[in-house]
């Protein structure tokens, strides 16, 4: 088992990474008067009974939500809050978020506002959640106008990453996780980028040593960034590489056509093109990025989107400043910076490279 400490003063916590860690959950809910398990239909059928056995003897309530990004909405937050009140959860209760990024986001946000905050535990079941969304304390839900428009920074009490849970994932969800994994190599660690490229097939085959090393390194990178900037006022912004175009694509497709990781892969590809177009990276490094992205097998053609619609979606991004659209763009291996583009500059790029 590997473990990492996220140092955030009074909000600090441990991340545990390894095989067969789900049964250890019992010790992390010790002292809770009641436990609320929030999960989705797909995860519950594999692990719901196991969780019940693990917390045997304690009062356990379950809420099973539909899988998928549309579940992240204020209506479901209200539903969860009503259940928490109805079941008598107190400030001594604990919430377990068992699922992917969607479950972690909505469970964490609901825990953060119930009675001004009760403890929650992240048990990520997807590769994307294990390498990214379960760490760092970003929680939230979507509005029609955009992704994660309502949310909070609220840290879990512990993150339990059991790599055995990846065995029940469909291949598409492993590809989705690659989006965030590749991102970490590009934004922070050139050597890690090379390691991912060399071991991508072993990762997709769930080779234990490779999976553990990659998950741990992603968590280390995110921990280093979040420890410096918990609430995204500075360096944490680099985690948004691929997410400006990615979020725009998700919004245009109503969060149904692409997984979050797939949208990030598309976003990284086109944002790397912007970086090359502006002279921030050379052709050779762009080809390295393109090669690893193409290994995911994702169709990179997004010319089906109407230019004005894609622009409109990106202008609503909460990261924007002063009427300009915020991008995190590569400047070299393991190095990125924030660049603000006017809608006109972005329209010129998109028209030139996507629509002719």
Curated annotation (Swiss-Prot):
GO terms for biological process: amino acid biosynthetic process; aromatic amino acid family biosynthetic process; chorismate biosynthetic process. Its cofactor is Co(2+); Zn(2+); NAD(+). Pfam families: DHQ_synthase (PF01761), DHQS_C (PF24621). Its EC number is 4.2.3.4. It is found in: Cytoplasm. GO terms for molecular function: 3-dehydroquinate synthase activity; metal ion binding; nucleotide binding. Keywords: Amino-acid biosynthesis, Aromatic amino acid biosynthesis, Cobalt, Cytoplasm, Lyase, Metal-binding, NAD, Nucleotide-binding, Zinc. NAD(+) binds at residues 101-105, 125-126, 138, 147. Its main location: cytoplasm. Pathway: Metabolic intermediate biosynthesis; chorismate biosynthesis; chorismate from D-erythrose 4-phosphate and phosphoenolpyruvate: step 2/7. Gene3D superfamilies: 3.40.50.1970, Dehydroquinate synthase-like - alpha domain. Zn(2+) binds at residues 180, 243, 260. Binds 1 divalent metal cation per subunit. Can use either Co(2+) or Zn(2+). It is an enzyme of class 4 (lyase). It catalyses: 7-phospho-2-dehydro-3-deoxy-D-arabino-heptonate = 3-dehydroquinate + phosphate. GO terms for cellular component: cytoplasm. Belongs to the sugar phosphate cyclases superfamily. Dehydroquinate synthase family. Catalyzes the conversion of 3-deoxy-D-arabino-heptulosonate 7-phosphate (DAHP) to dehydroquinate (DHQ). This is 3-dehydroquinate synthase. It comes from Alkaliphilus metalliredigens (strain QYMF). The lineage of its organism: Bacteria, Bacillati, Bacillota, Clostridia, Peptostreptococcales. The gene is aroB.
